């Protein structure tokens, strides 16, 4: 997807005026790249994030430049009440070097675990990965369909496509698995003494 960007002035007043006019202030930076303050249309950015999420290669055409810049969204800041994007950081990438970015975790097999009486609680929704810009995954997956016992499932069990390295500590808990109704059964068996 392509975004159109316009170079902008800096400062909180200028940023506030941009937001009121329907734009999001942002910055493009990266290794060997002079940081450039830009603005993008709020509707265009929101649509892109809604359709593709944050972990995708984006072509940003900066007004006055001949070629689009290859970037990824490094950080989105949102208004705490409205959830509208208030600022965006774009990391300009070198197509021949690896980058670090955050991608979502997709848990598969929850229905099978539920049929076995297990409840899956999500502890971590996204994870940092390292890969080339052309290998950015939609997500990394965690398959819980084979779980038969309660307990934690860690980042060591995440599955990433070839060329993608998960940077999360392997011992970090991604989901917790508990027995459905386990607490109630225990209370019933230790009921009041006669």
Curated annotation (Swiss-Prot):
GO terms for biological process: translation. Pfam families: Ribosomal_L25p (PF01386), Ribosomal_TL5_C (PF14693). Part of the 50S ribosomal subunit; part of the 5S rRNA/L5/L18/L25 subcomplex. Contacts the 5S rRNA. Binds to the 5S rRNA independently of L5 and L18. GO terms for cellular component: cytosolic large ribosomal subunit. This is Large ribosomal subunit protein bL25B. Belongs to the bacterial ribosomal protein bL25 family. CTC subfamily. The gene is rplY2. It comes from the Bacteria. This is one of the proteins that binds to the 5S RNA in the ribosome where it forms part of the central protuberance.
